[in-house]
Curated annotation (Swiss-Prot):
Record-listed E.C. numbers: 1.1.1.261
Protein function: Catalyzes the NAD(P)H-dependent reduction of dihydroxyacetonephosphate (DHAP or glycerone phosphate) to glycerol 1-phosphate (G1P). The G1P thus generated is used as the glycerophosphate backbone of phospholipids in the cellular membranes of Archaea.
BP terms from Gene Ontology: glycerophospholipid metabolic process; phospholipid biosynthetic process
Protein name: Glycerol-1-phosphate dehydrogenase [NAD(P)+]
Underlying gene: egsA
């Protein structure tokens, strides 16, 4: 029998004001009172300084690092500065947590994930998106040892991030369809449990679409729970298949082509509309659901020129070529790409 290790967070703490418990969480989980706290320039003010204050009151020795970008250089810096720490605390958005995730994996120390936004499922997943000289790559990493998601803080972030997180979860639907296709056509390993969890999470969020609003803590809580669940599906699968398919290829292509890309989740949401059309699914419902939460559904709403949308569709199949999707091995012709974007009203 084939056995595989599934990494999941040991503890998940989510709720209003839960960040105040971070000292107790660290005391219960960590062998020593010395940690590296990684933040971003903005997130340090939002939550990082408060985490530092709480842990200093609990007599922790703290090494502070601020990063601007999720690059290989940032990871190397954090690896060097955290090698003697008992854990890394990533306090911030996706870039901060991705760098913290890779550094903790390399140093074989736990990561405590403290997200300040609900923009994508990186807060709980065993994957990290890191930029190198070839672009952005998705790397395997250890899942966070613990996760502390303060919904008060997350709900105060710009609503655009929460809507992007919602969109990222909805993209699970096309991702799983792509995964099924790869299983049928090229016999790629498929996990029924991971796929079921991923799809269930997306459907639960669709059911909650009417209740997702700006500056609303319950809305933030719903999206956070969905992102955590999506991250767990990735852990169960052992790869990002349950949450990343042709729609993510489109988003990554846009990142490479567009001068000013939108948020990852926003691009994946628009990609989901078009890929659902290709898959023969109910793309109109996807579009309607995203509109309910005020997430972008068009090139104009993404703030990206229509030509870049077309070019990203044409180039998308070249992203992670080993990952088979509805785009196939040869991708889309320009005529097909234009037709898909027009039919789904992503372009006019």
């Amino acid at each position: 029998m084939d056995f595989r290790n599934v990494q999941l967070p040991r503890e998940i703490h989510s709720g209003s004001g839960i960040i105040e418990e971070i000292g107790d969480v660290c005391d219960n989980l960590l062998p020593k009172k010395d940690v590296t706290i990684l933040t971003g320039p903005t997130t340090k003010k939002i939550a990082g300084n408060h985490v530092i204050e709480i842990l200093k009151e609990s007599n922790y020795e703290i090494s502070e690092i601020t990063v601007n970008l999720a690059t290989e250089e940032s990871v190397e810096e954090v690896v060097k500065d955290s090698k003697d720490s008992s854990a890394i605390l990533g306090v911030g958005g996706g870039k901060v947590i991705d760098v913290a995730k890779m550094a903790s994996t390399i140093n074989h120390i736990p990561l405590i994930s403290v997200p300040t936004t609900a923009a994508h499922d990186g807060m709980a997943s065993p994957r990290a998106s890191i930029k190198n000289d070839k672009g952005t790559v998705s790397l395997k990493a250890n899942a966070p040892f613990a996760l502390i998601a303060d919904t008060t803080i997350i709900s105060q972030a710009p609503y655009r991030f929460t809507a992007a997180g919602f969109s990222d979860i909805i993209s699970n639907l096309t991702a799983v369809e792509d995964w099924k296709l790869a299983y049928k056509l090229i016999n790629e390993p498929f996990s029924d449990s991971a796929a079921a969890l991923s799809v269930m999470t997306a459907k639960l969020l669709i059911d909650e679409a009417d209740n997702i609003h700006p500056n609303n803590e319950n809305s933030a809580s719903v999206v956070v729970k969905g992102l955590i669940s999506s991250g767990m599906a990735i852990s169960i699968a052992g790869n990002s298949r349950p949450a990343s398919g042709s729609e993510h290829k489109f988003s990554h292509a846009l990142d490479m082509i567009a001068p000013k890309p939108a948020l990852h989740g926003e691009q994946c949401g628009v990609g989901t509309i078009m890929m659902m059309y290709l898959q023969g699914g109910d793309w109109q419902n996807i579009k309607s659901v995203l509109e309910k939460v005020n997430a972008p559904t068009t090139a104009k709403e993404l703030g990206i020129d229509e030509e870049y949308i077309i070019e990203a569709l044409i180039q998308a199949h070249n992203i992670r070529k080993e990952r088979y999707t509805i785009l196939g091995d040869r991708g889309l012709t320009r005529e097909a790409a234009e037709n898909i974007a027009l039919k789904t009203h992503v372009i006019e």
